[in-house]
Regions:
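Short beta-strand segments
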Residues: 7, 82, 118, 143-149, ...
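Short glycine-rich or small-residue beta-strand-to-loop segments that form or flank ligand, phosphate
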Residues: 77-84
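Conserved catalytic cysteine-centered active-site region
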Residues: 30-56, 84-142, 148
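Phosphate/pyrophosphate-binding loops at sites that engage ATP/ADP/AMP, CoA/4′-phosphopantetheine
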Residues: 61-77
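Short, active-site-adjacent cap segments at secondary-structure transitions
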Residues: 13, 86-88, 151-153
């Protein structure tokens, strides 16, 4: 029986550690370490340097996942990139990651399908389920799934924005979902959504400045 399992994992966070105290001393936010820690459990987050894109973070995580799985980029059959902070409105980060992995270079070129999944916090789970389905169906042997965000450039790093600015940072994680004939791997996946509450937390495109 054809099964799917996670053959490799990788993660990456930028080197700039921003502590709760840094939010006050570096950015002038009226807050404190104790206030944030008590309400969120967060002690620190990472911020990317200027010019570092979400696909750059995804690349580092992807390289580590490939190494962990003992695979090369050319072994991949599909790239899935989950993010709500892409490099551009379009195209998606997946095609940028494909190029950065060297899959568009000369004799090593392998133009595998690459697509983004934009489903907010659940995007990585939906991507993992999609990878699972591709592998189980026989359409792919190795699928790269990346979840990455670069939220720091969009944060209101002021006292006015502290309700959100204290929560988010930048980073990436990646897994390789691979085929196996052994009786092991990812079990049954069950996804669901409830559109009745879609407007409870939303941002309309035309509201984005």
């Amino acid at each position: 029986m054809r099964n799917a399992f996670i053959s490799g994992t990788g993660s990456y966070t930028p080197p700039d550690v921003v502590t709760n105290d840094d939010l006050r001393t570096r950015f002038g936010i009226d807050t404190s370490h104790e206030w944030i820690l008590q309400r969120t459990g967060i002690e620190a987050r990472r911020f990317s340097a200027a010019g570092v894109a979400t696909s750059d973070l995804g690349l580092e995580a992807a390289k580590r996942a490939l190494e962990n799985a003992n695979l090369a980029p050319q072994d991949l059959d599909l790239i899935l990139f989950a993010t709500l902070s892409p490099d551009h409105a379009f195209p998606g980060c997946g095609v940028y990651l494909q190029e950065k992995l060297g899959l568009c270079d000369g004799a090593n070129a392998k133009f595998v399908p690459a697509m983004d999944v934009r489903n907010q916090c659940s995007g990585f789970l939906y991507s993992l389920a999609t990878a699972h389905a591709f592998v189980r169906s026989g359409a792919a042997k190795h699928v790269l799934v990346v979840g990455a965000e670069t939220h720091s450039p969009m944060l209101d790093l002021s006292t006015r924005g502290r309700g959100v600015a204290t929560l988010f940072g930048d980073g990436a994680g990646a897994v390789i979902v691979s085929r196996t004939e052994e009786n092991r791997g990812i079990g049954e996946i069950s996804l669901g959504a409830d559109g009745r509450y879609a407007d409870v937390l939303s941002q309309k495109v035309w509201d984005i400045k």
